[in-house]
Amino acid sequence: MRAYTLIAPAKINLFLQIIGDHLQQDQPTGYHNLVMVLQSVSLSDELQLRPLSGEARSLRLDPPILLHCDHPQVPLDQTNLVYRAAALMWQKFPGQAGVEITLHKRIPIGAGLAGGSTDAAAVLVGLNLMWELGLTQLELQELGSQLGADVPFCIRGGTSLAVGRGDQLSPLPDLEGIYVVLGKYHDLSVSTPWAYQTYRQQFQASYAQTLEEQEQRRQQGGSGALLKAIAHRDGGQIGQLLHNDLEKVVLPAYPRVEYLRQQFANQSPLGTMMSGSGPTVFALADSAAAAEEIYAGVRGAIADPYLDLWICQLCNQGIQVQPL
């Protein structure tokens, strides 16, 4: 049985519009109806999957899953999405060999970059190969949807339009080659449930109330112009059309995030925005040199030892596999 290394890219949002409450037969489900453009970036975690060693098998783990991580704040039990992904596969395909997972964490935790989701996606892809299950990408995405709304996207990666709860995906043309500078304070996190609940409290009166109204709102929204810019790979237009409704509630509540966004904007990028519910802010650049200038400008403007910055690129794929 082979062992595998998997590269799991982070994800940012280029567009996030809240249409209203997610409805089934005009009844709210408790989620939001969203229109998003999701984008993989080259900042990645790395996972190694291998069959359990004899020593590990002697521990009689149930399920037979052993997780290691080089980040001290990452839990190693069922509270970790990586562990839950492996447990889900074991539940669906019992009797397979146990697995030992080593996670090398590079994507910051609590950053809104789908770090947990992309790691879970890597486990699904890796176990499908290791156990020789022969599952299709669509079947893996259906399993992933049981773990979280971002997991199906992270399996395929690249650039996608996501609607509904965010799990109805349509692939878009690749944007590989555009650079992105990411910024996050490592002592700061934003609760995603808080962000959406606060948005609902403040803006529910403006929600589209029926499925028909929501579809009209979606078609009239700004995503169409962004999709056209993506089709033409027009980085300047893409940068100008970035949009995130959650900025309306997160930025006023988190002045450091708002200040970081302003400092990114001061560097004249193609565009800048908070990703998802934050607190990560990003700026797009059309070259490595421009990205370096943005990085240096923000670093010089914010003398905060808790601010982490990364330069990476938009990338055109999700989970990448390398046999060990």
From Swiss-Prot:
Return the InterPro entries for the record: GHMP_kinase_C_dom (IPR013750), GHMP_kinase_C_sf (IPR036554), GHMP_kinase_N_dom (IPR006204), IspE (IPR004424), Ribosomal_Su5_D2-typ_SF (IPR020568), Ribsml_uS5_D2-typ_fold_subgr (IPR014721)
* Family indicated by similarity: Belongs to the GHMP kinase family. IspE subfamily.
The biological pathway it contributes to is: Isoprenoid biosynthesis; isopentenyl diphosphate biosynthesis via DXP pathway; isopentenyl diphosphate from 1-deoxy-D-xylulose 5-phosphate: step 3/6
Keyword flag Transferase = yes
Q: Which residues form the active site?
A: 11, 150
Q: Which gene encodes it?
A: ispE
Q: Any idea what job this protein has?
A: Catalyzes the phosphorylation of the position 2 hydroxy group of 4-diphosphocytidyl-2C-methyl-D-erythritol.
EC numbers for this chain: 2.7.1.148
Species: Cyanothece sp. (strain PCC 7425 / ATCC 29141)
The name this protein carries in UniProt is: 4-diphosphocytidyl-2-C-methyl-D-erythritol kinase
